[in-house]
Amino acid sequence: MKSCPKCGQQAQDDVQICTQCGHKFDSRQALYRKSTDEDIQTNNIKMRKMVPWAIGFFILILIIILFFLLRNFNSPEAQTKILVNAIENNDKQKVATLLSTKDNKVDSEEAKVYINYIKDEVGLKQFVSDLKNTVHKLNKSKTSVASYIQTRSGQNILRVSKNGTRYIFFDNMSFTAPTKQPIVKPKEKTKYEFKSGGKKKMVIAEANKVTPIGNFIPGTYRIPAMKSTENGDFAGHLKFDFRQSNSETVDVTEDFEEANISVTLKGDTKLNDSSKKVTINDHEMAFSSSKTYGPYPQNKDITISASGKAKDKTFTTQTKTIKASDLKYNTEITLNFDSEDIEDYVEKKEKEENSLKNKLIEFFAGYSLANNAAFNQSDFDFVSSYIKKGSSFYDDVKKRVSKGSLMMISSPQIIDAEKHGDKITATVRLINENGKQVDKEYELEQGSQDRLQLIKTSEK
């Protein structure tokens, strides 16, 4: 269809004269229009054929761009660069993320220690070189799957391993730091509280027992901590250094605000050594001049005293208070007994004991003769006055005499004797009828007019 340029009437392309106004159409213009329409149609066909190729080319360009983007972030070299940049820039959070595993969570403070350790024990330049070389060799190798970066002293500091692939094309490199277990061995049951792996942690260690406090990556650590014992609570640090260990464990040095007490006693020469005690903060312990007591918190006063026995009497020192301001890691204190009081008492008791021993010597000399006479004559009356009537020992000896089973004794010696009220205990060494020396313990009762009678006896 075409329009009349004069009146606008629509007409067929092959019409030569307008039927409304009689205008004569130009035949050349019709031919041109027809040619133009054919060209447009031809061009449209060509364009439709080119579109798929253009789309394919565009997709190819996108794939190439995507490949290079993935390569920049996921190739072994890119993975290495991420770790290197984090260490170079002291990015402890990034390093913590890269080194954390399912079994061992690394927190940012631990990563900070690790970064410093690498720089001190390997050197940043050497570490970067070793890491790049290791990754390159692993990436090219078809057999090796893991290798270690080491410190100058030969300790493993980083494990580099191939762990599958990323996006089909790239080897996935894993970076993990080897771990060791710091161990404590307290003198008494102790509770430790500190932060590890980004979380608060509590470890309870029994006295004199090796106890691990966790798993840590290489470094020189000084961890803020609290510890608690029956003596109190302490603030301080747990310190350990991987350089000082060639095994799977590393010893912990405790650095807490604590005081250890060394005690010296004076005026105690007459006291029984095994009876000497030290009481610190109401807790009584055996005394030893070579022992230190504690530890105790340095922020609290300490009360201390000592006691001991002489001739079964307990003597004590005055209680001293050590002010918190005077407490040091090693604190020495001297406790004084009243030596004159002790010596006077010992002298008095020794006189009494000598008098008692003399009485017992005389008593057992007569008893041994009476015992033997009762045996020889089968007559209990010879020995009955030496034994308290109604006691089990009285009945036992009487029965033995009647059966002829009473043992003969001789040469009694008084080894030891003590008196408590009207009761006396004595250790006597005898020779029995078989000629053997035996020690027997007797209990006697002192009645009216200081008369002694046996109550019971037993072998020592």
From Swiss-Prot:
Q: Which cysteines are joined by disulfide bonds?
A: none
- Enumerate the Pfam families for this protein: TcaA_2nd (PF22813), TcaA_3rd_4th (PF22820), TcaA_5th (PF22819)
Enumerate the Extracellular topological stretches: 71-460
This molecule's function is given as: Plays a major role in decreasing resistance to glycopeptide antibiotics.
Zn finger (C4-type) ranges are 4-21
Q: So which domain of life are we looking at?
A: Bacteria
Q: List the ranges whose topology is Cytoplasmic.
A: 1-49
Q: Name one GO molecular function term.
A: zinc ion binding
Q: What triggers expression?
A: Strongly induced by teicoplanin, vancomycin and oxacillin in strain RN4220, a restriction defective laboratory strain derived from NCTC 8325.
Keywords associated with the record: Antibiotic resistance, Cell membrane, Membrane, Metal-binding, Transmembrane, Transmembrane helix, Zinc, Zinc-finger
Q: Where found?
A: Cell membrane
Q: What would be one Gene Ontology cellular-component term for the protein?
A: plasma membrane
Protein name according to UniProt: Membrane-associated protein TcaA
- Quick one: which gene encodes this? tcaA
- The membrane-spanning stretches of this chain are 50-70
Q: Which InterPro entries match?
A: Mem_prot_TcaA, TcaA_2nd, TcaA_4th
Q: What happens when the gene is disrupted?
A: Increased in resistance against glycopeptide antibiotics, especially teicoplanin. The resistance phenotype is lowered by several folds in strains carrying mutations in the rsbU gene which codes for a positive regulator of sigma-B.
Biological process, per Gene Ontology: response to antibiotic
Please report the record's description of how this protein sits within the membrane: Single-pass membrane protein
Q: Which family does it belong to?
A: Belongs to the TcaA family.
